[in-house]
């Protein structure tokens, strides 16, 4: 257990660390711009007859930049209403969620993204705030690298050792 590579083997609900993904989809689809605003319901939003979302503060009107800065669950849930389930699912797959990465290491988890046929009316809203899916740390790092690299996925490399100029191992 102590030798387990948790970066690739443990899948978890990413929560707020995932919110940049629906933001990227919204910008990609041009459904919103960073200066557009969303009303965040003063901190409590009824998604369906028995499901409420809350923010940690009672926000009213927030720009997309502020929704990201303040990590507004309500803002992201409403943002997700601007795209359909299939677009979100395809975007998640594009970023590598729900599949193993390119590395060849044992015990890598693919995480879990349910097929859209198994989504509820509120799944898209919950996925946008990092719930109802599971991912690995490597998958999240790869997704962030796609954003940092202008939409291009750079294949990760596994480093076996590092040598100094005298070809002595400095890391193994």
Model-predicted regions and their roles:
Residues 1-16, 21-172:
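Beta-lactam-recognizing serine transpeptidase/beta-lactamase-like catalytic domain environment
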